[in-house]
């Protein structure tokens, strides 16, 4: 099956809502509409930027989509500081990131919570981008494939095959995030192929063949071409490079198969 590439720009805790508007305008200017026929492009801003991004995307009828960086497993209630999937859906979000390594590390989120958040996202017709990945010691010990397969199982626990068919998986080796180090294309393919194989066991081979698997970890315009050429890598979860509108547009154009804008 031919899977349409997805380029997702995770802005993390960067850019106020004025800066968000400027960046989306830059991306829109730098990446003409024709590219969106061949690649899906989404930005993942901080919560405080979402309404401004929504207004711009809707007003200018942009084909760019957007999403949230996290959500609560709860719909509403006494959960100070949390954001529900219902709120994100009301803002027009298409995607939401769950289980990012920074959430797992700094907020002690485990696989069970990630699975609950993925289910909450699906309940509100949001596509969860479920993140998994290993630390450097696991990679150096040669246990990276087994680690990611186990984390995938835990992070999708309780989801039906139909629900699994609606998720996106992002493999993000923790040692490569924001470090400038990037897993080689063959290394990324090794893990992404194992992810797809496990999805076949958890759901079905047909569903596994349709689910998009992204690579995340120091993705930029220089390495996206080689990464996305791999059989089981369907795009990128982009960090720092997504804050540069021109580079992000170039990256997306490469993922679309070119030519450069």
From Swiss-Prot:
Binding site for substrate: 10-12, 178, 218, 239-240
GO biological process: gluconeogenesis; glyceraldehyde-3-phosphate biosynthetic process; glycerol catabolic process; glycolytic process
Pathway: Carbohydrate biosynthesis; gluconeogenesis; Carbohydrate degradation; glycolysis; D-glyceraldehyde 3-phosphate from glycerone phosphate: step 1/1
Record keywords, A-Z: Cytoplasm, Gluconeogenesis, Glycolysis, Isomerase
EC number: 5.3.1.1
Family (UniProt): Belongs to the triosephosphate isomerase family.
Catalyses which reaction(s): D-glyceraldehyde 3-phosphate = dihydroxyacetone phosphate
Active site positions: 100, 172
HAMAP family for this protein: TIM_B
InterPro entries: Aldolase_TIM, TIM_sf, TrioseP_Isoase_bac/euk, Triosephosphate_isomerase, Triosephosphate_isomerase_AS
Main EC class the enzyme belongs to: isomerase
GO molecular function: triose-phosphate isomerase activity
Localization per Swiss-Prot or TrEMBL: Cytoplasm
The keyword Isomerase appears for this protein: yes
Subunit structure: Homodimer.
Gene Ontology cellular component annotations, sorted alphabetically: cytosol
Organism annotation: Mycobacterium marinum (strain ATCC BAA-535 / M)
Job of this protein: Involved in the gluconeogenesis. Catalyzes stereospecifically the conversion of dihydroxyacetone phosphate (DHAP) to D-glyceraldehyde-3-phosphate (G3P).
Entries under PANTHER family matching the protein: TRIOSEPHOSPHATE ISOMERASE
Protein name: Triosephosphate isomerase
